[in-house]
């Protein structure tokens, strides 16, 4: 079971990774003159998103609901966050690769192709949704109902058995 002190630590780590993601999304364009620094920031951002995915799944595995065999219930409740986070990771990696390819040799020019602008807008839109849904999921996973046997869990288990 996830204890309060551990949950606070995990939640703080998740929010720290989200803040880093927000920081890179906000200020990475200011570093276009230093492509190596921008590349390092992008790599760390992608790793932070991947760590957030791993942390959410570890929190799933720690729940009583998961241990009782109701994996489908957890994934049904949180499938939006799982899908959105995966899409956001793919969009972020795509944007980072494209930006680095366009600007690596000539970082002093400010080139934006139509495709790059479109990808940029979708990645930033996905970033807003990712932050909202990820925070909501992280807080909802702190609900004690997920970590102990309860009437709610028994009802859900009976519905699955039917």
Curated annotation (Swiss-Prot):
Keyword Protein transport: no
Subcellular location: Vacuole membrane; Cell projection, Cilium
Transmembrane regions listed in the UniProt entry: 7-27, 41-61, 80-100, 115-134
Coiled-coil ranges from the UniProt annotation: none
Family indicated by similarity: Belongs to the TMEM138 family.
Single biological process term from Gene Ontology: cilium assembly
Major location category of this protein: membrane
Protein name, as recorded: Transmembrane protein 138
One GO cellular component term noted in the UniProt record for this chain: cilium
Keywords: Cell projection, Cilium, Cilium biogenesis/degradation, Glycoprotein, Membrane, Transmembrane, Transmembrane helix, Vacuole
Topology class, membrane: Multi-pass membrane protein
Pfam families the UniProt entry points to: TMEM138
Role this protein plays: Required for ciliogenesis.
Glycosylation site residues: 6
Species annotation: Rattus norvegicus
Domain of life: Eukaryota
